[in-house]
């Protein structure tokens, strides 16, 4: 590998670092060759079988409904997507599940509901109102780049949405994880009005990034369990 190739791999690795908790580079060599292909024809020839141009969301290791998942098709998970400037994501929310408050530093996010009913909340900046909308099947909303947003399934059935983002390296930052797990506690405590003991207790209960989704409100989980639905987060 020449200097140019080494540099390109370094840039790829740096660009994907922020989403490494969710997206792993499935084939670094193929990704490098795709991004360096001199022509579109050369690029296409890297994918000799027609099936090589297809991404199967349901075959991905992070695909789950318990509590749910965010499955991304981007240059990390699907090298064929490199160079198109987009990420497509399948959002799965199991009963009473949610995507915790988060933001994408490098992408605007278009989200459309496939089925069910999903409540969404979005805050663009200090001083802006909280925008709350309910997405029923066929309805879409937009989360501008770097806006804080969250989505919640308050029903007892699985809900699915599709997300299109205008970057193949969107980045995702979960607000609670950033505050309570990743920043120095001595900086966070004054900002949230906590004492050291309170802060440590909160940090221990923040869910891991995991598959991108977490179990939501306890009252919803209890309601669905009482109605006879199998809801694992209610234990």
Where are these regions (language model features)?
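Conserved metal-binding segment of the jelly-roll/cupin
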Residues: 95-96, 134-156, 165-166
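Short acidic-glycine-tyrosine-enriched beta hairpin
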Residues: 81-85, 125-146
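Short, conserved secondary-structure segments in the cores of folded domains
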Residues: 89, 99-101, 109, 131
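Glycine- and acidic-residue-biased ligand/ion/polar-headgroup-sensing regions
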Residues: 94-97, 104-126
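Structural motif
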Residues: 117-119, 148, 158
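A short, N-terminal "cap"/entry segment at the start of jelly-roll beta-barrel domains
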Residues: 11-89, 100, 202-235
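A short hydrophobic beta-strand segment most commonly corresponding to one strand
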Residues: 157-175
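Classical eukaryotic N-terminal signal peptides for Sec-dependent ER targeting/secretion
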Residues: 1-11
């Amino acid at each position: 590998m020449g200097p140019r190739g080494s540099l390109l791999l370094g840039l790829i690795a740096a660009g994907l670092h922020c989403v490494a908790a969710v997206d792993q580079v499935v084939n670094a060599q193929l990704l490098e060759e795709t991004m360096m292909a001199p022509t579109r024809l050369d690029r296409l020839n890297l994918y000799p079988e027609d099936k090589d141009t297809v991404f199967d969301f349901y075959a991905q290791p992070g695909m789950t409904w318990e509590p749910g998942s965010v499955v991304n098709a981007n240059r990390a998970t699907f090298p064929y997507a490199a160079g198109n400037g987009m990420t497509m994501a399948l959002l799965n929310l199991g009963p009473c599940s949610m995507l915790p408050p988060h933001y994408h530093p490098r992408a605007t996010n278009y989200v459309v509901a496939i089925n069910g009913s999903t409540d969404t909340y979005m805050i663009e900046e200090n001083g802006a109102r909280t925008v709350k909308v309910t997405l029923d099947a066929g309805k879409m909303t937009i989360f501008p780049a770097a806006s804080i947003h969250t989505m919640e399934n308050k029903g007892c059935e699985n809900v699915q949405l599709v997300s299109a983002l205008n970057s193949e390296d969107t980045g995702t930052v979960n607000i609670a994880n950033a505050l309570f797990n990743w920043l120095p506690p001595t900086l966070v405590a004054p900002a949230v009005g906590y004492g050291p003991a309170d802060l440590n207790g909160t940090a221990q209960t923040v869910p891991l990034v995991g598959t991108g989704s977490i179990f939501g409100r306890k009252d919803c989980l209890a309601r669905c369990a009482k109605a006879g639905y199998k809801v694992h987060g209610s234990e």
